[in-house]
């Protein structure tokens, strides 16, 4: 898409794994790449001022789903209370972090041993993730967002035909939680 928009012919190279692409970028083996937020932060911290974010999918494709939590349909049907408890816990944590990034800064060392060895780096990581709006306060999972994501995958050739939402997703647990805790 970008090559067509900006009329250039890139040399395409397939490198599996965001962390491997980040290392290839840092070592000068490639000039540009798509990497996940964790590796964006790592690259920016390892080489300050040498690399810049060219496109943020969150900005260019609002509503695009990047990640998700998956479970077998049978498990979801048999354990709705467990699924909803997990979703509620995640959303309340997302909201707390979005409202008060210092909360994550103080909690991260409890769960990530060694992370507090470099508090400035941890601060930059927290600020970057919050700045990238990684944690949507409402979960970011809607039929509309899913449709946009599937359409993009079809457009770029990752899917041959659109997958019908109902065949791979269920909104009921998310909607039940949002009904209880409210939407933001």
Q: Each predicted region: which residue ranges?
A:
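Glycine-rich, flexible loop/turn motifs
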Residues: 65, 72, 137, 161-164
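Secondary-structure end/capping motifs
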Residues: 78-160
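Surface-exposed charge patches
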Residues: 1-3, 23, 41-42, 151
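Ligand-binding cleft/hinge of the Venus flytrap
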Residues: 1-14, 44-48
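Pocket-lining segment of extracytoplasmic ligand-binding domains
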Residues: 19-114
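Residues that cap or flank secondary-structure elements
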Residues: 13, 31-32, 141
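Conserved C-terminal helix/tail region of periplasmic/extracytoplasmic solute-binding proteins
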Residues: 147-184
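Glycine-centered small-residue hotspots that permit tight backbone geometry or close packing
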Residues: 16-17, 133
């Amino acid at each position: 898409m970008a090559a067509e928009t900006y009329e250039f012919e890139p040399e395409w190279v397939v490198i599996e794994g965001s962390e491997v692409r980040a290392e290839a970028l840092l070592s000068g083996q490639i000039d540009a790449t798509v990497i996940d937020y964790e590796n964006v932060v790592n690259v920016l911290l390892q080489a300050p001022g040498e690399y810049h974010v060219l496109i943020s999918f969150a900005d260019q494709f609002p509503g695009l789903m990047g990640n998700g939590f998956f479970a077998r349909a049978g498990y979801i049907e048999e354990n709705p209370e467990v699924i909803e408890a997990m979703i509620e816990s995640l959303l309340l944590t997302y909201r707390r972090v979005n409202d008060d990034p210092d909360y994550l800064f103080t909690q991260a060392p409890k769960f990530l041993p060694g992370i507090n060895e470099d508090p400035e780096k941890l601060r930059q990581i927290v600020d970057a993730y919050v700045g990238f709006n990684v944690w949507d306060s409402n979960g970011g999972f809607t039929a509309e967002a899913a449709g946009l994501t599937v359409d993009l995958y079809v457009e770029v050739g990752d899917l041959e035909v659109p997958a019908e939402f109902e065949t791979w997703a269920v909104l009921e647990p998310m909607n039940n939680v949002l009904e209880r805790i409210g939407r933001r």
